Amino acid sequence: MKYFLFISIILCSLNSQGQELYVYTEPASNIPARSISAKLTSNIVTRQNPYNKVMQRYTPEVFVGLNKNWMLRAGATFANMHTDNFRWESVYMYGKYRFLSSDDTHSHFRMAIFGEAAYSRSPFHFDELSLQGDKSGLQLGVVATQLWHKLAISGSVSHLQGLHSSRNDKTLYIPSRIYQAMNYTVSAGYLLLPFEYKDYKQTNLNLYTEFLAQQSLDRKAYYVDFAPAVQLIFNSATKLNLGYRFQLSGDMQRMAKNSWQISVERTFLNALKRKK
């Protein structure tokens, strides 16, 4: 009976916060404590300059909710984006600490700090500083999320440092390479269905709009992207995401200015049981 009550409370919590499970960014909230999530993401770039070929990247990830404040995420990427053949590309580790929580009826506010470290064996291509397979580096940032009933709005700012051997050599690159940047994101999610929550087995339909921007600190270069997405949540534990990301403005050299993303994620509640 206690186990049933615990599961019911957790599932209701997942349902009420579904609209802040963003597709392209992380909210200030964490996955449930002592839970594990497994996720597989596919990014597809259609034929466009400069490569004029269909490129794919697959990212398996594992999320671990250590407690209500700490969360870890580890992943790897496999792709043919920087090479002709499809191969293992990178590994990374992400951690998030929620340091502020303010709860009210049908609303809450969260703030968290996050850090990420990534190693990539991909060649140094393009200006964009991305730790999702493209570059080795470090990232540190802060994120805030506000939930009002069916609407969730989130924003983040982070600093990135690219780590590549060319950073310390004496070669003169034209244009100069980018090793430092600031990332900015603004995301909004809305719970469209169900209109009334009755049971955790109801399918949720969430709509998202996200803005993602990067500004180089080494020279004047930037981009601003827009990423609408749709999300289905089944049994409050399995998520299916579909998004399309495209550039609104910018002057950075990038691998692609638009791409599709599809992902599926399964959460295993109370997988890390407390020792008695």
Annotate each PLM feature:
Residues 167-169:
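Covalent nucleotidyltransferase core used to form phosphodiester bonds in nucleic acids
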Residues 18-149, 153-155, 159-164, 175-231, ...:
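Transmembrane beta-barrel domains of Gram-negative outer membranes and organellar outer membranes
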Residues 1-4:
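Positively charged n-region of N-terminal signal peptides that target proteins for export
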